[in-house]
Amino acid sequence: MYDGKSFYFEINDIPIYMKGANQVPLDYYPSRMMEKSEIDWIFTSAIEANYNMLRIWGGGMYMTEYYYEMADKLGMLIWHDMMFSCKFYPFKQEAFIETSLIEVREQAGRL
């Protein structure tokens, strides 16, 4: 039972200590950040730092399939924000809610 005195992750009822970083876009030009060599560098750096989790910042971007495949292959956990950050959103507008639901369904299924 959660007592509010600690904060940790559990996977299959096992407490896991997370060590990682917040990943923001590494380049002004997204296409350069999506190159396999850049993605390999991200994961090599994370592993060398003994990280076991990377967080994709909600003000950034969704990564390529290769990124998620590498995370899976290397056992790197990904804490993935949806791309809603640093802005007021029109939550009372039906069109915004509808398009947001589409995005969440598509990305959650992909991730």
Task: Report residues per predicted region.
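Active-site-adjacent substrate/metal-binding segments within catalytic domains
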Residues: 1-87, 94-111
